[in-house]
Curated annotation (Swiss-Prot):
GO biological process: apoptotic process
Native organism: Oryctolagus cuniculus
Phosphotyrosine: residues bearing it: 49, 98
Cellular localisation: Mitochondrion intermembrane space
Main location: mitochondrion
Coiled coil, from the record: none
Keywords recorded for this protein, A-Z: Acetylation, Apoptosis, Electron transport, Heme, Iron, Metal-binding, Mitochondrion, Phosphoprotein, Respiratory chain, Transport
GO CC terms of this entry: cytosol; mitochondrial intermembrane space
PROSITE patterns registered for this protein in UniProt: CYTC
Pfam families, per the entry: Cytochrom_C (PF00034)
Lineage per the UniProt record: Eukaryota, Metazoa, Chordata, Craniata, Vertebrata
Residues with N-acetylglycine modification: 2
InterPro entries: Cyt_c-like_dom, Cyt_c-like_dom_sf, Cyt_c_1A/1B
Entry-annotated residues carrying N6-acetyllysine: 73, 100
Protein name: Cytochrome c
Length: 105
């Protein structure tokens, strides 16, 4: 799997303007990601998701995040996440390693 420290830098650069990871963190433009692993799409309490996100019905894990983060709009057509994605697989692996740790603390 990826490098947690590199993943943290990627999160700060590409994700933190819209997402928080800490327990009890507030929703921003995107939902708080605490507890992400093992949760189904569109399930963060108190966040207003698109029907596309709620109806996707997958459970977030390393494999689903690897695919989603490459091209979010392709993976969930109709998502309001405007992020274009991370094309480099090793960068996605680093980000996922960080998320796995940070969203579970």
């Amino acid at each position: 799997m990826g490098d947690v420290e590199k993943g943290k830098k990627i999160f700060v650069q590409k994700c933190a303007q819209c997402h928080t990871v800490e327990k009890g963190g507030k929703h921003k433009t995107g939902p708080n990601l605490h507890g992400l692993f093992g949760r189904k799409t569109g399930q963060a309490v108190g966040f207003s998701y698109t029907d596309a996100n709620k109806n996707k019905g997958i459970t977030w894990g390393e494999d689903t995040l690897m695919e989603y983060l490459e091209n979010p709009k392709k993976y969930i057509p109709g998502t309001k996440m405007i992020f274009a994605g991370i094309k480099k697989k090793d960068e996605r692996a680093d980000l996922i390693a960080y998320l796995k740790k940070a969203t579970n603390e």
